[in-house]
Amino acid sequence: MIISTTSQLEGRPVAEYLGVVSAESVQGINFVRDFFARFRDFFGGRSQTLESALKEAREQATEELKARARQLQADAVVGVDFEISMPSVQGGMVVVFATGTAVRLK
């Protein structure tokens, strides 16, 4: 399964557009480690806790996007876009939304 942020794949023309597919992943963030991450963020350091949660959420959303595209018998998902949200005021979770267009290639 090909996943691409571009609307076309070089050398692989689209035969059929199958529809929009979407997926989401929610990851909790460890509050104790996140407390120390806030200090690093304040002083300009990188937050491993948040980076790990974002990476895991993005990977899970991508796998779910592939699964939903396979249900449509797609060869690829093009025009993929990721949106990140932290809905909790305390920053206790991160949500990644992934959307794209499932296509069948020639």
From Swiss-Prot:
Assigned protein family: Belongs to the UPF0145 family.
Protein name, per record: UPF0145 protein PSEEN3024
Domain of life: Bacteria
Pfam families (alphabetical): YbjQ_1
Residue ranges of coiled coil: none
